[in-house]
A protein has these predicted regions:
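Active-site groove signature of glycoside hydrolases
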Residues: 1-2
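A structural motif corresponding to the C-terminal lobe/cap of the Radical SAM core domain
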Residues: 5-11, 15-186
Length: 187
Protein backbone atom coordinates (compact mmCIF):
# COMPACT_ATOMS: atom_id res chain seq x y z
CA UNK A 1 0.00 0.00 0.00
CA UNK A 2 1.64 3.20 -1.18
CA UNK A 3 -0.21 5.48 1.22
CA UNK A 4 1.72 7.79 3.55
CA UNK A 5 -1.26 7.83 5.92
CA UNK A 6 -1.85 4.05 6.02
CA UNK A 7 -0.96 3.74 9.72
CA UNK A 8 -2.51 7.03 10.85
CA UNK A 9 -5.82 5.28 11.58
CA UNK A 10 -4.74 2.20 13.55
CA UNK A 11 -8.14 0.42 13.66
CA UNK A 12 -8.40 0.83 9.87
CA UNK A 13 -4.83 -0.47 9.35
CA UNK A 14 -5.56 -3.46 11.58
CA UNK A 15 -8.83 -4.20 9.73
CA UNK A 16 -7.09 -4.06 6.35
CA UNK A 17 -4.32 -6.32 7.70
CA UNK A 18 -6.88 -8.89 8.86
CA UNK A 19 -8.55 -8.85 5.44
CA UNK A 20 -5.16 -9.32 3.76
CA UNK A 21 -4.53 -12.22 6.13
CA UNK A 22 -7.74 -13.90 4.96
CA UNK A 23 -6.42 -13.70 1.40
CA UNK A 24 -3.19 -15.41 2.42
CA UNK A 25 -0.93 -12.96 0.60
CA UNK A 26 2.20 -11.17 1.71
CA UNK A 27 2.11 -7.42 1.49
CA UNK A 28 3.94 -4.22 2.37
CA UNK A 29 2.96 -0.66 3.19
CA UNK A 30 4.21 2.75 4.18
CA UNK A 31 4.28 3.43 7.91
CA UNK A 32 5.13 6.21 10.28
CA UNK A 33 7.77 5.28 12.84
CA UNK A 34 5.27 5.39 15.69
CA UNK A 35 3.04 2.36 15.10
CA UNK A 36 2.52 0.53 18.42
CA UNK A 37 3.73 -3.01 18.97
CA UNK A 38 0.23 -4.54 19.10
CA UNK A 39 -0.68 -3.10 15.69
CA UNK A 40 2.64 -4.22 14.20
CA UNK A 41 1.99 -7.72 15.56
CA UNK A 42 -1.47 -7.86 13.97
CA UNK A 43 -0.03 -6.68 10.67
CA UNK A 44 2.81 -9.22 10.77
CA UNK A 45 0.47 -12.09 11.70
CA UNK A 46 -1.61 -11.22 8.64
CA UNK A 47 1.12 -11.30 6.00
CA UNK A 48 3.01 -8.02 6.39
CA UNK A 49 6.52 -8.46 5.02
CA UNK A 50 7.96 -4.97 4.67
CA UNK A 51 7.41 -1.44 5.92
CA UNK A 52 8.63 1.65 4.07
CA UNK A 53 9.39 4.14 6.83
CA UNK A 54 10.21 7.82 6.36
CA UNK A 55 12.59 8.53 9.23
CA UNK A 56 14.00 11.60 7.40
CA UNK A 57 16.55 12.52 10.11
CA UNK A 58 18.06 11.25 13.33
CA UNK A 59 18.23 14.77 14.74
CA UNK A 60 15.25 15.89 16.82
CA UNK A 61 15.64 19.58 15.94
CA UNK A 62 15.61 18.81 12.20
CA UNK A 63 12.43 16.74 12.68
CA UNK A 64 10.91 19.67 14.55
CA UNK A 65 12.00 22.11 11.82
CA UNK A 66 10.13 20.11 9.16
CA UNK A 67 7.10 19.55 11.41
CA UNK A 68 7.53 15.77 11.20
CA UNK A 69 5.68 15.21 14.46
CA UNK A 70 8.03 12.39 15.37
CA UNK A 71 10.33 11.77 18.33
CA UNK A 72 13.66 10.04 17.71
CA UNK A 73 13.18 7.83 20.78
CA UNK A 74 9.75 6.68 19.57
CA UNK A 75 11.25 5.83 16.17
CA UNK A 76 13.95 3.77 17.88
CA UNK A 77 11.37 1.80 19.89
CA UNK A 78 9.20 1.27 16.79
CA UNK A 79 12.18 -0.07 14.85
CA UNK A 80 13.21 -2.34 17.71
CA UNK A 81 9.67 -3.76 17.72
CA UNK A 82 9.78 -4.36 13.96
CA UNK A 83 13.07 -6.25 14.29
CA UNK A 84 11.63 -8.31 17.17
CA UNK A 85 8.60 -9.25 15.06
CA UNK A 86 10.64 -10.03 11.94
CA UNK A 87 9.23 -7.15 9.88
CA UNK A 88 11.66 -5.92 7.24
CA UNK A 89 12.21 -2.16 7.04
CA UNK A 90 13.18 0.05 4.12
CA UNK A 91 14.13 3.32 5.80
CA UNK A 92 14.14 6.62 3.96
CA UNK A 93 16.24 9.60 4.97
CA UNK A 94 16.65 13.15 3.66
CA UNK A 95 19.80 15.25 3.87
CA UNK A 96 19.92 19.01 3.42
CA UNK A 97 16.79 19.89 5.38
CA UNK A 98 16.56 23.29 7.12
CA UNK A 99 18.97 23.41 10.04
CA UNK A 100 21.20 20.70 8.56
CA UNK A 101 24.89 20.82 9.43
CA UNK A 102 27.80 18.45 8.90
CA UNK A 103 27.18 17.33 12.49
CA UNK A 104 23.46 16.61 12.02
CA UNK A 105 24.23 14.61 8.89
CA UNK A 106 26.69 12.50 10.91
CA UNK A 107 24.07 12.17 13.66
CA UNK A 108 21.54 10.88 11.13
CA UNK A 109 24.05 8.40 9.71
CA UNK A 110 24.77 7.16 13.25
CA UNK A 111 21.02 6.92 13.90
CA UNK A 112 20.51 4.84 10.75
CA UNK A 113 23.33 2.51 11.76
CA UNK A 114 21.86 2.18 15.26
CA UNK A 115 18.30 1.38 14.18
CA UNK A 116 19.62 -0.79 11.33
CA UNK A 117 16.85 -0.91 8.71
CA UNK A 118 17.31 -3.76 6.23
CA UNK A 119 17.70 -1.31 3.34
CA UNK A 120 17.67 2.44 3.05
CA UNK A 121 17.25 5.28 0.63
CA UNK A 122 18.89 8.67 1.04
CA UNK A 123 17.42 11.65 -0.80
CA UNK A 124 18.27 15.31 -1.07
CA UNK A 125 15.85 17.86 0.35
CA UNK A 126 13.83 19.01 -2.65
CA UNK A 127 12.19 22.44 -2.44
CA UNK A 128 9.38 21.92 -4.94
CA UNK A 129 7.68 25.16 -6.02
CA UNK A 130 4.58 25.81 -3.94
CA UNK A 131 5.89 23.99 -0.86
CA UNK A 132 6.75 25.52 2.49
CA UNK A 133 10.38 24.45 1.97
CA UNK A 134 10.57 26.31 -1.35
CA UNK A 135 9.13 29.45 0.22
CA UNK A 136 11.50 29.22 3.19
CA UNK A 137 14.52 28.57 0.94
CA UNK A 138 13.65 31.47 -1.36
CA UNK A 139 13.08 33.90 1.51
CA UNK A 140 16.35 32.93 3.20
CA UNK A 141 18.52 32.75 0.06
CA UNK A 142 19.16 29.01 0.44
CA UNK A 143 18.08 28.07 -3.08
CA UNK A 144 20.77 27.56 -5.70
CA UNK A 145 19.10 29.09 -8.77
CA UNK A 146 21.40 27.09 -11.10
CA UNK A 147 19.87 23.89 -9.68
CA UNK A 148 16.29 25.08 -9.61
CA UNK A 149 15.25 22.16 -11.84
CA UNK A 150 16.03 19.69 -8.98
CA UNK A 151 17.43 17.10 -11.45
CA UNK A 152 20.12 17.22 -14.11
CA UNK A 153 19.77 16.27 -17.78
CA UNK A 154 20.32 12.59 -16.86
CA UNK A 155 17.57 12.56 -14.25
CA UNK A 156 20.01 12.63 -11.32
CA UNK A 157 18.85 14.61 -8.31
CA UNK A 158 20.71 17.87 -7.70
CA UNK A 159 21.28 19.48 -4.31
CA UNK A 160 19.57 22.83 -4.87
CA UNK A 161 19.82 24.02 -1.27
CA UNK A 162 22.79 25.52 0.51
CA UNK A 163 23.20 27.13 3.87
CA UNK A 164 25.79 29.59 5.21
CA UNK A 165 27.47 26.69 7.05
CA UNK A 166 26.82 23.90 4.48
CA UNK A 167 27.29 24.11 0.71
CA UNK A 168 25.14 22.35 -1.87
CA UNK A 169 28.23 20.32 -2.84
CA UNK A 170 28.69 19.14 0.76
CA UNK A 171 25.01 18.20 0.94
CA UNK A 172 25.21 16.31 -2.38
CA UNK A 173 28.39 14.46 -1.37
CA UNK A 174 26.84 13.47 1.97
CA UNK A 175 24.42 11.13 0.16
CA UNK A 176 27.23 8.88 -1.06
CA UNK A 177 28.93 9.14 2.33
CA UNK A 178 25.68 8.06 4.02
CA UNK A 179 25.35 4.98 1.80
CA UNK A 180 29.03 4.10 2.21
CA UNK A 181 29.02 4.42 6.02
CA UNK A 182 25.77 2.47 6.33
CA UNK A 183 26.39 -0.39 3.91
CA UNK A 184 30.16 -0.77 4.31
CA UNK A 185 30.41 -0.61 8.08
CA UNK A 186 32.19 -3.32 9.96
CA UNK A 187 30.18 -6.05 11.63
Amino acid sequence: FDDDTFTDDLPRAEAIAREMGKLGVTWSCNAKANVPYDTLKIMKENGLRLLLVGYESGNQQILHNIKKGMRVEVAKEFTKNCHKLGIKIHGTFIVGLPGETKETIQETIAFAKEINPHTLQVSLAAPYPGTALHKQATENGWLNVDAAELIDENGVQIAPLHYPHLSHTEIFESVEEFYRKFYFRGS
